[in-house]
């Protein structure tokens, strides 16, 4: 599997590079970084003390010409440029970027008519199994329970609520036969009035080096149930991304997510 990594100098990019280098079936063939990055020209394995022969570059076409797959955990504007390059070079994509607009998501859907794409806000096996637990719980706590989602991430995260929190909200709303767009409440301030019993609330915490904590609270009268997933390392995301690459190796064009990759549908 000839794999290139986008955002190669970032926290997630470095974890992905390490995972690829440690996988006997994978070959690192490219490492992309943003224009102007001080790491351009550096060996992709330098932070591991390894010489890979792959230099960080901002030349999209040079990298895509070598790759079969690109793993991308960057930002929406960068990812959309990578999608265009992938279409030019027929490269399959594993996308863990969050914060897309509705229009950008539509563009991803259109691109998937020509290339294979796994798009998931969280590639952890644990998170995706948690989504199934939430669907089950929501069906049994559909009456008399208020639903709130609380997430916490490191101080550098730029979007809120997290993509994973939104996935959890969509899983719960879908199980209840609702649209998240119609029932989500993002943060509260001032005099908000009494809680709408059909709403799903979101709260976001940012601080320190928190990798990612997510709790879905079902609060009833006399009891409350909390379903929590905590990430202590980005290793789980990197391993999930490699599972997604293997999944795409046996697939043609189409838009998939980790529920497809893990056979949880």
Swiss-Prot record:
Major subcellular site: cytoplasm
Coiled-coil ranges per UniProt: none
Catalytic reactions of this protein: (S)-2,3,4,5-tetrahydrodipicolinate + NAD(+) + H2O = (2S,4S)-4-hydroxy-2,3,4,5-tetrahydrodipicolinate + NADH + H(+); (S)-2,3,4,5-tetrahydrodipicolinate + NADP(+) + H2O = (2S,4S)-4-hydroxy-2,3,4,5-tetrahydrodipicolinate + NADPH + H(+)
PROSITE patterns xrefs: DAPB
Pathway per the UniProt entry: Amino-acid biosynthesis; L-lysine biosynthesis via DAP pathway; (S)-tetrahydrodipicolinate from L-aspartate: step 4/4
Record-linked SUPFAM superfamilies: Glyceraldehyde-3-phosphate dehydrogenase-like, C-terminal domain, NAD(P)-binding Rossmann-fold domains
CDD domains attached to this UniProt entry: DHDPR_N
InterPro entries the UniProt entry points to: DapB_C, DapB_N, DapB_N_CS, DHDPR_bac, NAD(P)-bd_dom_sf
Residues given in the record as NADP(+) binding sites: 34
Ligand binding ((S)-2,3,4,5-tetrahydrodipicolinate): 154, 163-164
Signal peptide: none
Active site: residue positions: 153 (proton donor/acceptor), 157 (proton donor)
GO molecular function terms listed in the Swiss-Prot or TrEMBL record: 4-hydroxy-tetrahydrodipicolinate reductase; NAD binding; NADP binding; oxidoreductase activity, acting on CH or CH2 groups, NAD or NADP as acceptor
Binding site for NAD(+): 7-12, 33, 96-98, 120-123
GO biological process terms held by the UniProt record: diaminopimelate biosynthetic process; lysine biosynthetic process via diaminopimelate
Cell compartment(s), UniProt: Cytoplasm
CC per GO annotation: cytosol
Record-listed E.C. numbers: 1.17.1.8
Entry keywords, A to Z: Amino-acid biosynthesis, Cytoplasm, Diaminopimelate biosynthesis, Lysine biosynthesis, NAD, NADP, Oxidoreductase
Recorded family membership: Belongs to the DapB family.
Function: Catalyzes the conversion of 4-hydroxy-tetrahydrodipicolinate (HTPA) to tetrahydrodipicolinate.
PANTHER family xrefs: 4-HYDROXY-TETRAHYDRODIPICOLINATE REDUCTASE 1, CHLOROPLASTIC-RELATED (PTHR20836:SF0), DIHYDRODIPICOLINATE REDUCTASE (PTHR20836)
Protein name as catalogued: 4-hydroxy-tetrahydrodipicolinate reductase
Origin organism lineage: Bacteria, Pseudomonadati, Pseudomonadota, Betaproteobacteria, Burkholderiales
Gene name of the encoded protein: dapB
């Amino acid at each position: 599997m000839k794999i290139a990594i986008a955002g190669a100098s970032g926290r997630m990019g470095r974890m992905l590079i390490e995972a690829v280098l440690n996988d006997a079936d994978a070959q690192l063939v490219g490492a992309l970084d943003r224009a102007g990055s001080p790491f351009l020209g550096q060996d992709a394995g330098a932070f591991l003390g390894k010489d890979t022969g792959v230099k960080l570059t901002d030349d999209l076409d040079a990298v895509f010409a070598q790759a079969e797959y690109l793993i991308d955990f960057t930002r929406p504007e960068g990812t959309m440029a990578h999608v265009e390059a992938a279409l030019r070079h027929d490269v399959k994509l594993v996308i863990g970027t969050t914060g897309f607009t509705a229009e950008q998501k539509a563009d991803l859907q259109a691109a998937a008519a020509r290339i294979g794409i796994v798009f998931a806000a969280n590639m952890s096996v644990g998170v995706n199994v948690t989504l199934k637990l939430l669907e089950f719980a929501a069906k049994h706590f559909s009456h008399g329970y208020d639903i709130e989602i609380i997430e916490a991430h490191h101080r550098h995260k730029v979007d809120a609520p997290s993509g994973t929190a939104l996935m959890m909200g969509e899983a719960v709303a879908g199980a209840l036969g609702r649209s998240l767009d119609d029932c989500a409440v993002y943060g509260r301030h001032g005099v908000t009035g009494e809680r709408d019993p059909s709403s799903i609330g979101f709260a976001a915490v940012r601080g320190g080096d928190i990798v990612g904590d997510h709790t879905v609270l079902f609060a009833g009268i006399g009891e409350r149930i909390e379903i929590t997933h905590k990430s202590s390392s980005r290793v789980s995301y990197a391993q999930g991304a490699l599972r997604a690459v293997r999944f795409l190796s046996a697939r043609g064009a189409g838009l998939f997510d980790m529920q497809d990759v893990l056979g949880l549908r």
